[in-house]
Amino acid sequence: MANKKLMRVVHAWYDACMLKAVMFDVDGTLGDTLPLCIETYRRLAEEVTGRRPEVAEVTGHFGLSDRGVLGKLVGMEPDDPALPVRRMVEIYGELHPAMAPAPFPGAVEMLRGVRAAGMRIGIISGKEAHTAAPTLRFFGLDSLYDWAAFGLPDRNVKAERLLEAMQVWKLQPHELVYVGDAPSDITMAHRAGVRIVNAAWAPGAAQEAEACLALHPDYRLTDMAELLPLLLRL
């Protein structure tokens, strides 16, 4: 009788501590798509304004959704019907095969491992569905997640999306972790009270190492192969 009671206590403790869901950013986390995004914005801005913006000008607006970034670059409101969103999607699709032909090596296997461990998988991207969803399909990842939420043109809403995921799945903050590459991902995860794995395996990740470390991520990995073993320990 005592042993059964002890086992119930152990199982209850295990269930309370076990990680239940993993949320992933897309660009720079599941695939090296940041150069693709930057080139899409630069090319379209040049078509519209005649001026090709510098890379830093483009990335300075990251955190906003596609319409938010594009609107800033071409001097238009994100809800302006004339904003060339369709053309942006066209350019993005044209460049995708050459600039981002596949997800990071091991990404598919890692996601399958997370799912096999019984954890839910979510996507939280600052992009909007019209560019995030095509990338997930192109990479063959569209069947490997359970829920997705995207960005807004006026502000970074990843903290709100994390809170939304917890509400949808009835989770506590300790039962969920976010995996993202940008300094803002760390800030947004902390704001939501969620642990953050700073994904530092993209080719350009070292450029933001100082900024990321200054924000004290819970974990920082430079090799995606280390991610699944970490998640299984949490």
Predicted features and spans:
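Conserved Lys-Pro-Asp/Glu-containing loop-to-beta segment of HAD-superfamily phosphomonoesterases
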Residues: 158-186
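Substrate-recognition/cap helix-loop segment adjacent to the acidic, metal-dependent catalytic center
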Residues: 46-48, 69-78, 108, 112-122, ...
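Structural recognition of alpha->loop->beta junctions
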Residues: 140-148, 209-229
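Short secondary-structure boundary segments
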Residues: 126, 200-203, 224
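Short acidic capping loops at alpha-helix termini that bridge into adjacent secondary structure
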Residues: 53-57, 80, 143-147, 173-177
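Acidic, Mg2+-coordinating phosphoryl-transfer loop and its flanking beta/alpha structural elements
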Residues: 177-219
